[in-house]
């Protein structure tokens, strides 16, 4: 009987813990939906509404103009190249931070997050000071696609590192040791044991990095210089349209960038989920 009374006393406490600080699940879901709508969905709906304000013909003329198409080409080309490069070096940095011990490791780990905290216009100023016409290191990337690429690499690198790092920490080292005991070399162990486990994280980091890159403005505006067909990315073309009081055209370009980001993220998420499922079945 005593145990029954204790159980009755504990039951409300257990239910309280399940309900959480924001009340029952229905309340939490409602709060989440409202906040998501206010912060994300309504602004997206507003930009789509503005883009459609001039009709389909005006939308098509805005996104298919020569200047717009050139900005898309420059943006997608450089962003894709930067994403691939950051996949390689982001994985390398994450590996070093997880698997290797060296002096200053914590400092390096903290520096990785610096592009998150640094205002992007400050990042652009840093790029200009280091790689501009008066470069102290003799590298002159101002008004070049290389300069835009370096700036984008700077602001997108953390997405890959931080996506891969926690997964790498959770990988079972015993599986790697077992493969080594069977005669597998380092490259074979990495490609057959480690890489499959990292694939979902790599795809997630790549998607976030690419999406950030195609919409970046502050870090490229100074070093790139908005040279049409060479360094003018879509975000800079949007600014030009706004300065010319063509907000409908600017909204149309924005919708295209948003659509590209959404499609890329969706595809990579589906591929990553399938890769994770195959990894679970293989295990």
Where are these regions (language model features)?
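Interhelical loop and adjacent transmembrane-helix boundary motif
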Residues: 64-66, 220-267
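Transmembrane-helix boundary motif in ABC transporter permease subunits
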Residues: 20, 57-59, 81-112, 125, ...
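Transmembrane alpha-helices
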Residues: 30-35, 84, 114, 118, ...
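C-terminal transmembrane helix and the adjacent membrane-cytosol boundary/short C-terminal tail
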Residues: 3-5, 9-12, 27-31, 104, ...
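Short hydrophobic faces within alpha-helices
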Residues: 72, 97, 114, 174-182, ...
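Membrane-interfacial helix termini and adjacent extracytoplasmic/periplasmic loops
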Residues: 11-20, 56-64, 69, 99, ...
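Hydrophobic alpha-helical transmembrane segments of multipass integral membrane proteins
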Residues: 38, 73, 77-89, 93, ...
């Amino acid at each position: 009987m005593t145990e029954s009374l204790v159980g009755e006393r504990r039951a409300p406490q257990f239910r309280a813990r399940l309900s959480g600080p924001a009340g029952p699940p229905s309340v939490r879901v409602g709060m989440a939906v409202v906040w998501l709508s206010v912060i994300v969905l309504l602004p997206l709906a507003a930009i789509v509404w503005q883009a459609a304000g001039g009709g389909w013909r005006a939308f098509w003329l805005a996104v298919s103009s020569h200047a717009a198409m050139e900005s898309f080409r420059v943006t997608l080309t450089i962003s894709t190249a930067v994403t691939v490069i950051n996949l390689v070096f982001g994985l390398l940095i994450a590996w070093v931070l997880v698997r290797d011990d060296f002096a200053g490791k914590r400092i390096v780990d903290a520096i990785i997050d610096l592009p998150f905290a640094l205002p992007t216009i400050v990042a652009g100023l840093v790029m200009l000071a280091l790689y501009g016409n008066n470069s102290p290191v003799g590298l002159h990337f101002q008004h070049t696609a290389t300069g835009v690429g370096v700036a984008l690499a700077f602001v997108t690198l953390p997405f890959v590192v931080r996506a891969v790092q926690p997964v790498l920490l959770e990988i079972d080292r015993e599986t790697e040791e077992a493969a080594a005991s069977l005669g597998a070399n380092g490259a074979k162990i990495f490609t057959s044991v480690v890489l499959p486990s990292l694939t979902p994280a790599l795809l997630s980091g790549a998607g976030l990095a690419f999406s950030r890159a195609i919409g970046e403005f502050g870090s490229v505006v100074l070093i790139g210089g908005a040279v049409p067909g060479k360094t003018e990315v879509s975000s800079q073309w949007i600014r030009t349209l706004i300065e010319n009081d063509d907000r409908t055209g600017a909204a149309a370009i924005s919708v295209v960038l948003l659509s590209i980001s959404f499609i890329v993220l969706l595809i990579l998420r589906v591929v990553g989920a399938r890769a994770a499922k195959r990894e679970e079945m293989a295990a």
